[in-house]
Amino acid sequence: MINLASYSYPKGLHLLKSWQAGTEEAKAEIKSVFDAAIAGDFDENFSVLAPADEVHSTASVHMLALAILNDIYGVSSAEYYKTDPYRYVRANLTVGRLLGVKKLYMTWALYAFSCEVLGQKMMYPDKFPPGSDPDEALINKENCFELETPDFSAG
């Protein structure tokens, strides 16, 4: 069984760098890591609290997780963001650990999901995060003054 802790900084970062460089060895190794992650083998690691005497920060890692899953499994953008929440969370947290992040955060394409729920037509490119379709804007110069506050009590 793979131990995610053995990929602590900088080893995880080196693996990601080698994968991005396109080495077959790194692709095979990262596939093994993500096979274990998706199976839930790292869930206990994800529950480890970060040290309280340090300042923690991270960036949005969901796009890197998408790139990895697309490369090793062929997962499309729409599949990644809309079908399997366990895979989504585990892939994101694994990328965080590989980058050396001690305090894990969940990130997602909030800007896109917020629009889609309101009726915006979205584009889900194969390897990239979603975005609104610029040819079919939900809000335009003809309707921008007609906007009303959504009824949040209606569910």
Stretches with model-predicted labels:
Residues 1-155:
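Catalytic cores of TIM-barrel enzymes
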